[in-house]
Structures are given as C-alpha cells and as structure tokens.
Amino acid sequence: GKGRYLDDIRLPGMVYGAMLRSPYAHARIVSIDTSKALAHPNVAAVITAKDLETLGLAWMPTISYDTQAVLAGDKVRFQGQEVAFVIATDEYSANDALQLIDVEYDPLPAVVNARKALDPDAPLIRDDKTGQRDNLASPTWEAGDEEATDRAFAEADTVVTRDIIYPRCHPAPLETCGMIADFNPETGQLDIYNGNQAPHAHRTVYAHVAGLAEHMIRIKCQDIGGGFGNKVPVYPGYVCAIAGSIVAGVPVKWVEDRSENLLSTGFARDYVMHAEMCSKGGRITGLRVDVIAD
C-alpha cells in the first residue's frame, strides 16, 4: 500500500482529457464538427490539429527518429490514430463528449501487413513527407561480410532455408500510459507527473515540441505500474495534455483506458524473416537473414 502511482495524484483545479481515435486504418478527414461536444456543460475545450498548429504543437518526433502529427489533420494513417482531445471537469464527461464529435471520413485502401506494404502498388501511407515514394520508415540496414557469405554458400554441402514470422507482441502493463501536465503561466514552469522509463529523453522532446527551455520542465516520475518498453516513447496524449494545460492554465490529466492501451500503445517485434544457413562437413559456415520489421 505504499506505492504512489499517477492515479493517486490529485492537484487543485485539475481537469481531465480524453482522446478521440480513428476507427479507420487509412482515410481522409473531410470535416470535424466539435460544436456539440463544446456545448456539453462540463466540457472546457476540444483540441484538434488546427488548434495545435496555432500553438506550434502540431508535430512531434518519434522513437524511430521520424516525425508524426500529434493529432491527425488531413488524413488518418493507422487505426486508433489520435484525432481530437476533449478537456472536461471530470473523466466521465470527457469520454461522453467524445461521442458528440462528428468526424466525416473518406476511407482509403489500407496496408495490413509489412510485407504487403512493400509491394510496388501498395498505397503510400506517409504521403505528407516530401520525396517519400514507398512505405519504408528508415533506410535498409545491412551488416556482415557479403562476399565471404556468398563464398560459404557456394562451397556448402548443405543449405537449410526457413521462413519465420515473429508476431507482434503487446507489453500489457498493469498501469496504462498517462500524464498530468501542470503549466504555470506566471512562471513558465511546466511540471509533469508521468510514470515513464525515459524521463530525460521525454523532457528534451517536450522542450522541442512546446518551445520551452529544458530547465523550465520538471518531470516527476512516481512508481511505474509496469513498462516493459512501452513507456519509453512519447505519445500524442502527453503532448495534448501539455497543450491543454498551457491553454487552460490548470493541470490536465490524461490516462488511456485498457482498450486504448491494447490498440495504440507501443508494440514490439512483428518481424517477417527469410533465413538461410549453410554448412560444410557438419560445420556451420554461413548465415543469411532478410528481415522486414514493422
């Protein structure tokens, strides 16, 4: 009973955030109507991509040295992508207001696995990136002595080939991802309560995204209810909580529910591997592995 987790923290004047996510894996956003949600008596604000653009908070870096939209604006690119963020006086009202946001989508062809994503005729997902012509997130990485490996296979008396699929796995921590962002407009100090596995890296990201000096950001990590790697990345919900606190001037708490965690948290693995191993005289002499990693 001595543990102190994010959900144990209550700050004066704290409000609550909830995230609207896309039901589609790939679709254009035709329109977003937040008027009914804003009319809810307990709703303080509804944040969309346009609002974040005004604040200079529309984009964020990712753990794979890429960038992504904090909230989808013109298009959604994966199922569960964040579309709008509601801030209300209590958690129930925030979640109720999500149902009042009307988003019109124009569904597009989707890519459902990494191998098909590399097909020449696969739909281009990151068409927002200048010069992007395929669905490779990073350059092809190679290691080893190709010439020696080719020679080993040419001289081998036995070659074994296998196709191996290492499925995607979910870390499923007991405590889901969440944050309390508390921005003080008088001092410019941002206090963050957040159980994460990389607080110094998070501070750097928040400074970059929000335009604050790192020494003006203080991250207070309480006990972490499990992480297993999925509490290393920065999630859009964190940035939205910070944006909400900057706009409202009060603490904003966002915690994903279990369904959100299962859908949208950081997954691992999902490898498609083609492997060849060769031997000569009973001794392994060469190995080739082609890996597609999602």
Label every model-predicted segment.
Residues G1-L136, V159-R162, G237:
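Flexible, low-hydrophobicity surface segments
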Residues P123-A210:
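Helix-loop-helix junctions that connect adjacent transmembrane helices in secondary transporters/permeases
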Residues S31, V70, P173-C177, Y271:
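Residues that act as N-cap/strand-start positions at coil-to-secondary-structure junctions
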Residues L52-G56, G225, N261-L262:
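Short gly/pro/ser/thr-enriched loop/turn and capping motifs at secondary-structure boundaries
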Residues M19-A49, F85-E104, M179-A248, A293:
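Alpha-helical support elements that line or immediately flank enzyme active sites
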Residues S93-A117, L136-G144, R162, A201-H202, ...:
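Gly/Pro-rich active-site capping loops and adjacent beta-alpha segments
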Residues I63-A94, F228-G281:
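Glycine-rich and small/hydrophobic secondary-structure elements
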Residues G1, A45-A49, F78, V160-R162, ...:
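General beta-strand structural signal in soluble alpha/beta enzymes
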